[in-house]
Amino acid sequence: PTRRSSDLQQAEVADPALFYDHDTERRMILGEAIGLRAYMHFDLLRMYAPAPAANPNTRTFIPYVDKYPSYVNDKQTVSYCLEHAIADLKESQRILFDIDTESTNFNPDRRFVQKVAGEGAFAALRGYRLNYYAVTAILARVYLYAGMNDEAYAEAKKLIDEEEKTKYFAADESYYASDNFKNGNMKMYDNIIFALYSPTELVDWDSEINHLTDGKSESDQNYLSWSSKMLDAVYGIEKENDFRFKYQLESKYYGYNYRTLKYYKQVESTEYGKANNQIIPMIRMSEVYYIAAEAIYTEGDLLKIAEAKSYLEKVKKGRGIKTVDYSSVSSKNDFVNMIVNDARREFFGEGQTLYMFKRLNKVLTCDSGEIP
């Protein structure tokens, strides 16, 4: 966070003539630095402080560093940090709006694959940078975490409306998703709004953790896995149709265990293999639909309930589930549980499910029961 404050303070006063693309590039750096400051503080807050749902009150947990140089900073309350993160994200959003929305093409290949030669390379591959759409998605995430449902919905709706016009962040393209998986699109990167770039580290880690003993007998292999019992509980009757089960998991040990393939190194000669090997997902369009669904669902309001269901169905249908069963839903809590259930399939290995449980003050469980 301190480094980001340093970057933005320099960008604020720098002469635009120093930059290849002059003031556009200066503003891009400034907007990204402000957004990254909020992003990193928010993740630290989620990690080290209780969620608002746990009533942290006036206790203090982490500082919010917005000045450089800064040597010693007082810890602040959860509400203080959230207020400052929201303010930073709104300012970042304002600065980046013209830069990214004026682009005529923000499709997945432009975001993550197509490199640009020369000085223009700095402004390319915006999916690996904190672009306007990513800032908007993160602002929706922060608002929901803060319990500000109306504001969370408003930000999510901006992206949903954009997606309906441009199809930049395809969360619902079920007619080609299965072929994408087969051609190396294991992380569904077209759905990712913002990612980190990792040339080999992530696939190397997966190789060491999950595939080092592949040559041994089934009973002697070591890997991270889901149990069949856990999978049945999470996927239920949708299991056989869900692309995330069919393509992102591999049956092991006679069907008792299932190993994740999300980070398995893809063949780079396939259509999507190289891009998927390098991507670490940070926020997806599917999460934006989850946010909108949870935020708009209002008990007793049939129109809002129908709208909320349509957002969840966008994600599910894009994952091969053509019919969604709502027979277990009689309250908002039931509906939120459905969202959480789908998010567990969507986000495994991405670090978001834990914070969803924390935000909702839900108990974590495993095969043997509750996790302390």
Walk through the language-model features, giving the residues of each.
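Acidic/polar-rich alpha-helix caps and helix-coil junctions
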Residues: 3-210, 235-372
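Short, cationic low-complexity segments
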Residues: 214-232
